[in-house]
Design a protein with these regions (language model features):
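A short helix/loop element that forms part of the nucleotide-sugar donor recognition site in Leloir-type
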Residues: 161-162
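Glycine-rich phosphate-binding loop signature in dinucleotide/nucleotide-binding domains
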Residues: 71-78
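Carbohydrate-associated surface elements
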Residues: 132, 155
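Short His-centered aromatic/hydrophobic patch
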Residues: 61, 82-88, 106
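A conserved, positively charged/aromatic
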Residues: 96-131, 143-144
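Short beta-strand scaffold positions
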Residues: 35-37, 81-82, 128-129
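N-terminal strand-loop element at the rim of the active site
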Residues: 5-63
Length: 162
């Protein structure tokens, strides 16, 4: 399977660390993996495509959608996995234009505003890394039914690879 992970990439966070562990496992299983991110500091065998997803300016968002659309088509991506609000926003539109499967993981409590309270840019299925985040989205937004939002905890690699 060809998988594209999309992250904001404006600073190192837990989402990058846990995504790196997921990517390593996906590659170990034989999947082809790409990362679109402003920066990705963890060593990885995935192909990293630098795109300033963190830049939320309107023009930049349209350019990011175009760049993601090009990657999805060029690399025959089967699924896009977004890991931040900004990543979810641009991934949602790129996947709509390309008819590509899509999901998001919510790694932290969401800063809610009109658009993400009433408009689901996170995809038809979404993972939250803990019950607190899942509960926030179910209680404070109108975008999810309970069965659309599952808790999947971040995995960690316990064996050091030195």
């Amino acid at each position: 399977m060809n998988i594209l992970h999309v992250l904001s990439g404006d600073f190192v966070a837990g989402s990058e660390t846990s995504t790196a562990a997921v990517i390593d496992y996906q590659i170990k299983l034989g999947h082809q993996v790409w990362i679109a991110s402003g920066q990705f500091t963890h060593a990885t065998q995935a192909r990293v495509v630098p795109i300033p997803i963190y830049d939320r300016g309107l023009l930049r968002r349209f350019l990011n959608i175009r760049e993601l659309t090009q990657i999805i088509r060029r690399e025959n991506i089967h699924i896009v996995h977004a890991h931040s609000r900004a990543a979810s926003w641009v991934s949602y539109w790129a996947c709509r234009f390309t008819h590509t499967a899509y999901l998001s993981t919510l790694h932290g409590r969401q800063h809610l505003h009109f658009s993400n309270k009433w408009f689901n840019v996170y995809g038809p299925q979404c993972a939250a890394v803990c019950e607190n985040i899942r509960d926030q989205m179910l209680e404070e937004t109108r975008v999810f039914e309970p069965e659309q939002l599952v808790v999947i905890r971040n995995g960690i690699e316990t064996k050091a690879s030195h």
